[in-house]
Amino acid sequence: MSNLLVTTIQTNLHWEDKAANLQMLEQKIKSIREKTEVVVLPEMFSTGFSMKPELLAENMEGETMQWMKRVSAERKIILTGSFICRDAVNGHADEAQSQMVQTAYSVPTHYYNRLIWMLPDGQYGVYDKRHRFAFAGEDKHYTAGTKRLIASVKGWKINLQVCYDLRFPVWARQQSQPEGPEYDVLIYVANWPERRNLAWKTLLQARAIENQCYVIGVNRVGNDGNGIYHSGDSMIIDPMGEILYHKKDEEDVFTISLDKEHVKTIREKLPFLKDADSFVVFNEGNTTDL
C-alpha cells in the first residue's frame, strides 16, 4: 500500500490582499524541499476570513483559480484550500458544472466559501462549505454547500471540509458501505480563532477517533483585519487519536508521510465502525480521481 506525502502550510495572511497572499504562498510552496504530493492551505487563503464577498469574490476563471492551476502544474502537486467564489449555483466536480461556472455571471449570483482540490493536470474537485459561521455573519453573506467532496488519490480516499464544519460530526461521519469505510483521511482548512482553540484541538482528535482515520487540520496564525488572533494549532492526528504534529503561534511548513497500512491495521484490530448505526447523509458527495 502506498504512503501519501502531505504538506501543511500554517501561515499569517495579508488581510484582503490577494496579490500579497498568493505571492507569499507560492514562495512557501517553492521552499518545500521534501518530496510531497498534497499541499494543504488554510481557509480563504487568498484574503483571510472576510465578510466582503461583493468586493473580493472571483469566478472559477479568476486570479486564485488560475494561480492554483499554475502552481499545481509547475510543482506537480495536488493543491487544496478555500477561497471566496462568485457563482450562480453550488459547485459540482463535473464537466457540466465546469462549463457553467466558466461563463457564470448569471442571476442570481451566490457567494461561496469554496474549497478546491486542484490536480496537476488542471482537473479539480469542488466543495462549498456546508456550515456557515453565523456568529461572524457568514450565513448572511455566503450560500451553504449541499454536497460533500471525497477525493481519491493513490488508493486513498480523502474527505475535504472547511473550518466550522468541524463542529458537526454527522457531516463527517463514515457512511455505511459494503466495501468498508468511506474515507481514510479527513482534512479541515480553517481560520479558527485562538479564543476557541480548545474546541478546535479536541474536536480534531474526536473526528479521528470516531472515524478511524487520519485527520489534518490546517489553520492560519496572526491577527486578521478585525483584530482577532489566530494561534494556528494546526494538527495531524492518527486514527487512534495520537497527535503526530502540532504547531502553535508561529508559521510553519511541515511534511508527513501517511501510512495506509497503519489505518488498515487499526480498523482490522478494532473494527468499531462495523458496529455503527446505519444511516446516510442526504447526498453521496463527489469523487475526484488521480
Ranges and model annotations:
Residues 39-40, 157-162, 187-188, 216:
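Short hydrophobic-aromatic micro-motifs
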Residues 150, 220-290:
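C-terminal beta-strand edge segments of enzyme domains
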Residues 2-8:
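Extreme N-terminal starter segment of soluble prokaryotic enzymes
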Residues 62-80, 166-253:
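CN hydrolase (nitrilase-like) catalytic-core segments centered on the catalytic cysteine
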Residues 7, 116-118, 125, 235, ...:
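Conserved hydrophobic/aromatic positions in well-ordered beta-strands
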